């Protein structure tokens, strides 16, 4: 609606989604999903946290630096959506996934050996979409409603 309205007024808006449901991993998903927010977070949160962690030498390992920056970045994304538990848990969930994927990419010989094979891309897409859908479920707030219903019994 906003894109159409702005186009009618002659204002060009940036593309905000680029076929995110074709993503074969979570990094790919976040470069395609909500592009303006993802880019802003990458430039102003992830990069700055990463540089600060490297400069202050909080961790001796570059991989730990990146995983920490992913956690902070995705938590910031959760807080950006709101202060409800579901949004914060959603950000934390994606932070854990992004950090875990970073470790998997860097450390897994299986990944390095198979990442370009078609069967692996299909499997990776399937796993990624399931993880994203779990994230959407968390984002919806439904898990907390279900938990409250169970606790009231």
Q: Which functions belong to the PLM regions below?
A:
Residues 1-153:
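Membrane-embedded transmembrane alpha-helical bundles that form the catalytic cores
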């Amino acid at each position: 609606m906003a894109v159409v309205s702005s186009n009618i007024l002659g204002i060009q808006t940036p593309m905000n989604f680029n076929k995110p449901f074709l993503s074969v991993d979570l990094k790919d998903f976040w470069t395609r999903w909500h592009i303006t927010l993802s880019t802003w977070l990458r430039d102003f949160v992830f990069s700055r946290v990463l540089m600060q962690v490297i400069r202050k030498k909080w961790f001796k390992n570059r991989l730990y630096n990146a995983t920490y920056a992913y956690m902070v970045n995705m938590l910031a994304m959760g807080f950006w959506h709101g202060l409800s538990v579901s949004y914060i848990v959603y950000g934390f969930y994606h932070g854990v996934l992004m950090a875990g994927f970073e470790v998997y990419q860097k450390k897994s010989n299986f990944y390095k050996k198979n990442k370009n094979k078609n069967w692996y891309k299909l499997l990776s897409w399937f796993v990624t979409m399931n993880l994203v859908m779990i994230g959407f479920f968390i984002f919806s707030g439904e898990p907390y409603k279900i938990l409250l219903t169970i606790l009231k019994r």
